[in-house]
Amino acid sequence: GNFKFSKLENLDQFNLKPAFLNEGIIFFDNKGSVLRFNDEQKIIWKNNFYSKSEKKLKPKLNFAINNEDLIVVDNIAKYFSINLNSGELNWIKNNSYPFNSDIKIFEDKFFAIDYKNTLRCFNIMDGSECWNLQTEDSFTISNSKFSLIILDGKVIFNNSIGDITAVDIETGLIAWQLPTQSSSIINETYNFKISKLVSDGDAIFFSNNKNEFYSIDVKTGTTNWINKINSNLKPILTKDLIFTVS
């Protein structure tokens, strides 16, 4: 069906997506209300957990589904969990900084990255923080969303200055880190764009708008190869081929 949402400015820039269910979808409006629609486009429930002043900030929400719960992180430093069936709040918390990534779930934990280039691991049950890992910060705020993937017991993610970091999922300790940009990038992060990370299980692939397309080893973080391709769009893997659009 054609679901209609109240207007959100710069939607493409923030790479925001609805949460798709077996029957219907979940999305949000420009005041941060979360809405569940059925397949007939009828609203099953609609709830808002923001104060009057927070609603004026037009929070932008990222979703992940875990069994009967919807996990939400936003760009005004809140994160919360909602019961999918009732729309009622399980818990809500504040982070030190706004979030700037998708959410990844692994067993009883979920992961997200904030604007301070900090990867945070939270407990799904109550939202308590299990651990966090801050990577080097930049002087300007990134204009593109950070990406994270989970492989071989590690969370692997990028930050605003192009570092790719692998972290042990249980301990939060760094397994390896690969800087892909020179130190001068710290001043230029607003214009630096990097694609989402994708993997075939052995290598991680990503590209950026600095004319670099990388393949790096999952286990060690060493560079397999770099090609000259200018793209910040997510690469697509099919068997032995990689597709990208420059």
Which residues fall in each region the model found?
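Short loop/turn segments that connect beta-strands within beta-propeller blades
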Residues: N38-K42, N83-G87, N123-G127, I169-G172, ...
